[in-house]
């Protein structure tokens, strides 16, 4: 029976192998020359794509500014499809499914993505808020699976509730009532997000006006950031925080490629509504005082004037920081007004760094700078427990006999310096278990002092118990004390409270008496 020749048989010998060999030199150099992660966001993106076996898209994501994995998790259906189209993955639904699966794993179990990246210099990855950006992400997303007959769009779509749910759970700094509302950031500049100006929520003028030279001031305020337009204190950043944001933006901007006029023209031609809303900014002179206000108005990420934010919902510190960073970036490069994905990623990086530096500086402040009265009062309470004989001198020998407390709970709750000092003096010369007030660190925050306070009480309680056990045999022979018959469980906490000098165990004394009585009765019988 004659067989039909296979398609490879008609090719010249080695033709298929040579064709496959010609493809290899094109792929291997790109894999070898692939840029390694330089920031925390790029490292997270690298690990997610590595988990999904989609590292070929890594450079495309970086070139498009998609170095924020949380942005992919928070994206809605339309935004996610747009991102997939930007990186060239929209025509490959299987790749999209693999990416969705990796994103779900990253959101639910970030520990799976802790494998090291080869040849990554440790000093090149800024470790700002790693535990917060990589270790506490929790949320639920739809599985993205559909029947084979469904269109490709449904296969790579998240549930409609995923942006709202993840906005509450994946916010990098959940502080304040308005933390993490992803509805306000529209991803790329969509027509809905760049509608004409106006509306009820008009941005106010910045409190820190720019200098007459027209340059970007270092202390530029954030009054025009909040779209709520209240102009009050809650919608403004502190000048020190603004200074940190400006310094971080300038440091990142030194290595940031600036856009050109050709890019602006092409982007404005692609989006007519965007051109009508922000096109006039590119025609304004740099010395124009209104240019900064317009840039702040249209560079806002959270709380835009055309967003559907709940009335009365204030912006959190994290959102205000992102808005200020976005304004600073756009004032240095106006083309970022047209590339909101990249602008959002850069602003988040600045917000993480600035918040970390602010919290680090706050932890090093002295108690007087953090709110003197509460910390001083707490420090005084700790000092009273460390030196009770100085703060409260005993009036006489009666002070060495603290009043009897009937229960263990009351004794533990009212463990004061007076009762502790009385017990220690009754036992004998015992080394002090707590350092003097001069040894206490003065730069601890309130929660640190409370932790030290609780730790000292625990150590004093444990040391007191050990001191009683050690001194029991030592002082038992000197002054035996035979009080009423207390339960055995109350001995350790109540024996020294009942007698001036500790004595032998009451249960042992009573046991000896009962044994003698039993022997006497037995001998009589």
Swiss-Prot record:
Keywords: Isopeptide bond, Nucleus, Phosphoprotein, Repressor, Transcription, Transcription regulation, Ubl conjugation. InterPro entries: NAB_co-repressor_dom, NAB_fam, Nab_N, NCD2_sf, SAM/pointed_sf. Gene3D superfamilies: NAB conserved domain 2, Transcription Factor, Ets-1. Sumoylation by EGR2 represses EGR2 transcriptional activity in hindbrain. There is a cross-link at residues 379, 517 (Glycyl lysine isopeptide (Lys-Gly) (interchain with G-Cter in SUMO1)). One of its GO terms (biological process) is myelination. There is a cross-link at residue 517 (Glycyl lysine isopeptide (Lys-Gly) (interchain with G-Cter in SUMO2)). Residues 510-525 have a biased composition (Basic and acidic residues). Residues 353-384 are annotated as: Necessary for nuclear localization. Belongs to the NAB family. The NAB conserved domain 1 (NCD1) interacts with EGR1 inhibitory domain and mediates multimerization. This is NGFI-A-binding protein 2.
């Amino acid at each position: 029976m004659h067989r039909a020749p296979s398609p490879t048989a008609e090719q010249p010998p080695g033709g298929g192998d040579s064709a496959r060999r010609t493809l290899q030199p094109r792929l291997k150099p790109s894999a070898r020359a692939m840029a390694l992660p330089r920031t925390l966001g790029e490292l997270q993106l690298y690990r997610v794509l590595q988990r999904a076996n989609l590292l070929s898209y890594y450079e495309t994501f970086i070139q498009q500014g998609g170095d924020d994995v949380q942005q992919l998790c928070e994206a809605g259906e339309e935004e996610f499809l747009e991102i997939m189209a930007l990186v060239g993955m929209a025509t490959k639904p299987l790749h999209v499914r693999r990416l969705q699966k990796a994103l779900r794993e990253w959101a639910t179990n970030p520990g799976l993505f802790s494998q090291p990246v080869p040849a990554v210099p440790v000093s090149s990855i800024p470790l700002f808020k790693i535990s917060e950006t990589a270790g506490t992400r929790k949320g639920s997303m739809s599985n993205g699976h559909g029947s084979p007959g469904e269109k490709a769009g449904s296969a790579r779509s998240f549930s409609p509730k995923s942006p709202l749910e993840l906005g509450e759970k994946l916010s990098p700094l959940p502080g304040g009532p308005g933390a993490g509302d992803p509805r306000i950031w529209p991803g790329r500049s969509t027509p809905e997000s760049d509608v004409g100006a106006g509306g009820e929520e008009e941005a106010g003028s910045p409190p820190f006006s720019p200098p007459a030279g027209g340059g970007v001031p270092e202390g530029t305020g954030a009054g025009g950031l909040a779209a709520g337009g209240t102009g009050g204190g809650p919608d403004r950043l502190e000048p020190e925080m603004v200074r940190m944001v400006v310094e971080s933006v300038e440091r990142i901007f030194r290595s940031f490629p600036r856009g050109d006029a050709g890019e602006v023209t092409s982007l404005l031609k692609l989006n007519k509504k965007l051109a009508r809303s922000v096109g006039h900014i590119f025609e304004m002179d740099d010395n124009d005082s209104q240019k900064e206000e317009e840039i702040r108005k249209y560079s806002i990420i959270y709380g835009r004037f055309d967003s559907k934010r709940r009335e009365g919902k204030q912006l959190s510190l994290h959102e205000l920081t992102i808005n200020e960073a976005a304004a600073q970036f756009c004032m240095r490069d106006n083309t970022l007004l047209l590339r909101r994905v990249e602008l959002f990623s850069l602003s988040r990086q600045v917000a993480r760094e600035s918040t970390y530096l602010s919290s680090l500086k706050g932890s090093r402040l002295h108690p007087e700078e953090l709110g003197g009265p509460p910390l001083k009062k707490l420090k005084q309470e700790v000092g009273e427990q460390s030196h009770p004989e100085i703060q409260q001198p005993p009036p006489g020998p009666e002070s060495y006999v603290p009043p009897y407390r009937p229960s263990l709970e009351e004794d533990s709750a009212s463990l004061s310096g007076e009762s502790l000092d009385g017990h220690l003096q009754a036992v004998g010369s015992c080394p002090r278990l707590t350092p003097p007030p001069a040894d206490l660190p003065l730069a601890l925050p309130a929660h640190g002092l409370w932790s030290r306070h609780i730790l000292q009480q625990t150590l004093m309680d444990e040391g007191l118990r050990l001191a009683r056990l050690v001194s029991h045999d030592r002082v038992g022979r000197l002054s035996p004390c035979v009080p009423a018959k207390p339960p055995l469980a109350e001995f350790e906490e109540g024996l020294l409270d009942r007698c001036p000098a500790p004595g032998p165990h009451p249960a042992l004394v009573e046991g000896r008496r009962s044994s003698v009585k039993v022997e006497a009765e037995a001998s009589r019988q």
